[in-house]
Amino acid sequence: MRRFVIGQAKNLIDQSRRRQLHHHKNLSFVSLIPPFSAPSDSSSRHLSSSSSSDMSASDSSSSLPVTLDTINPKVIKCEYAVRGEIVNIAQKLQEDLKTNKDAYPFDEIIYCNIGNPQSLGQQPITFFREVLALCSYTALLDESATHGLFSSDSIERAWKILDQIPGRATGAYSHSQGIKGLRDAIADGIEARDGFPADPNDIFMTDGASPGVHMMMQLLITSEKDGILCPIPQYPLYSASIALHGGTLVPYYLDEASGWGLEISELKKQLEDARSKGITVRALAVINPGNPTGQVLSEENQRDVVKFCKQEGLVLLADEVYQENVYVPDKKFHSFKKVARSMGYGEKDLALVSFQSVSKGYYGECGKRGGYMEVTGFTSDVREQIYKMASVNLCSNISGQILASLIMSPPKPGDDSYESYIAEKDGILSSLARRAKTLEEALNKLEGVTCNRAEGAMYLFPCLHLPQKAIAAAEAEKTAPDNFYCKRLLKATGIVVVPGSGFRQVPGTWHFRCTILPQEDKIPAIVDRLTAFHQSFMDEFRD
């Protein structure tokens, strides 16, 4: 990988800034701006006193303007366990560790609760960040030294992208669906992946995949009589967004015994049951590869799902954000659009929305908030309403848009960055596969724990066969048994995982979700801590 010469880069930026400052000093209007005058001590005291009086008056009021009784009840109903109680406890422990290092049997909090790769040490892809840097600070493109610091293809790509942005400014608003040239690149990437045409006008760029999911829920749900079929266990975004928009989650249970299989008979059963209760089921959500379950659907299974949606008149919501995260040789990712087109289904046969994000895969750019949804099979008048919803949000952020285009159009053979890009990509994915295998094997060695094969995504979802005494202890604390286990695990080891009850599960079963994202050199220590804790827990509560 090319070494980035820090000193040269700093000098380059400083030179550019000095030129800009010299330019601004020559502008006559600068002298017209009055100097900032800080308030005097007396005025500060007056402001503070007035503020305190106002607050006291407000506090003494018998009627507060906002209470839990007066806010939208749908907000109270929605929950997001991935950042719930366990994480709140972890954050308090992390703060306390700064001043009370000897108070706990661990020296750090290890967050295995959320798919946030770079927070746990994963490095970004160099080519992606070079292009972002050049697009964000365009003055670098005018410096001769830039060619010694950045790859030639990142410079070329940055110029190409900037030419497509109004005013060549990444701080400007874009078209509500996203910059047209970037949507062209994404459509080309989809076509290269699937072997079927993709239309840039079907692409709606979003701040990660989550806003796209919310947008579709808002579009499809009119009342609690509208239902969305969701996999159980499910990613809490779905239950939360359905609750927030006032709909009904219609569960279909994945079969843990068959590696979290998706059975069409289960879909039919739950659909018929919902309809018998007067619920109009509008859509089927499928997460592939699975979150939190980590399974990868077979192409044959996907064909059955497509047929089911076609026969029942359901919108297929395909959450495909982990499409790059497949770790076993006998499984391969196939997009639902590719499967549908290979079956002969065209635009008029199936309403399909596919979601992609820059947060997952091998890139892990969660904080950049980039993603898109590809919307196909909707009538023109409905598409106009989707566009209107996108317009209300003005546009997604430009850096996220750029990244979304880059993950779908990375360096190709012969490009200056290709070899380093492939080395970084393969290094990350192969390491994730090793971590997944190590954790899977360790979990299956624990007493009363079973864990399905980690085929893809970023998670393991082991089943806890807890002793009755542990279940009774949890009931005494008025909490779910898996939540009880996870809290004890956190306080004993500093390891943060998410209780399975936060994802929903077959009644009477208990699980937790654990990411495979801590850096590879930390995995052995995590295994040791987890093993020691679990043995102690079972010794304490064994029937």
Swiss-Prot record:
Induction: Rapidly induced upon low-oxygen stress in roots and shoots. Its EC number is 2.6.1.2, 2.6.1.-. Residues 43-64 are annotated as: Disordered. The keyword Transmembrane does not apply. Disulfide bonds: none annotated. It is found in: Mitochondrion. It is an enzyme of class 2 (transferase). Keywords: Acetylation, Aminotransferase, Mitochondrion, Pyridoxal phosphate, Transferase, Transit peptide. Residues 43-63 have a biased composition (Low complexity). The lineage of its organism: Eukaryota, Viridiplantae, Streptophyta, Embryophyta, Tracheophyta. It catalyses: L-alanine + 2-oxoglutarate = pyruvate + L-glutamate. This is Alanine aminotransferase 1, mitochondrial.
